[in-house]
């Protein structure tokens, strides 16, 4: 079987530090498990910033906003100041809806699951650039 040189295995993250100016780090399963930082992750993040001055960005498929994602970091053992930004699917969806549909003034219906971390539907639609009428009249 031919050797695929596009993939390399490294014994330590430190093998990669000098090769890149920054890192995009997936949130769940790489940085934390939803309850606390994974073993060594908070220390590595601190070292990447303080010792090596690397730029760090969080990537997450959460439906929450980037701000909400960063606000949870302290409870997971991370200092938010170490991250340039957080890119979340929720934030990107809101941006896309705003850019694509807000000018048309079309109505929207949002389906999601209930969780303490999710934005309220009204707040999410406001982030999408929608004026939110406070009515549930189905005739509208």
Language-model features: locations:
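HAD-like aspartate-dependent phosphatase fold
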Residues: 1-140
């Amino acid at each position: 079987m031919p050797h695929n040189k596009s993939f390399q295995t490294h014994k330590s993250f430190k093998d990669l530090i000098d090769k890149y100016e920054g890192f995009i780090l997936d949130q769940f399963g790489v940085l934390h498990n939803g309850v606390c930082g994974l073993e060594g992750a908070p220390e590595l993040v601190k070292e990447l910033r303080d010792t090596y001055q690397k730029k760090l960005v969080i990537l997450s498929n959460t439906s929450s906003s980037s701000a909400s994602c960063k606000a949870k970091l302290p409870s997971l053992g991370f200092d938010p100041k170490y991250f340039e930004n957080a890119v979340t699917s929720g934030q990107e969806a809101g941006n896309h809806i705003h850019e694509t549909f807000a000018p048309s003034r079309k109505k929207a219906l949002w389906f999601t699951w209930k969780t303490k971390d999710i934005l309220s539907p009204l707040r999410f639609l406001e982030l999408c650039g929608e004026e939110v009428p406070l009515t549930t009249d189905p005739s509208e």
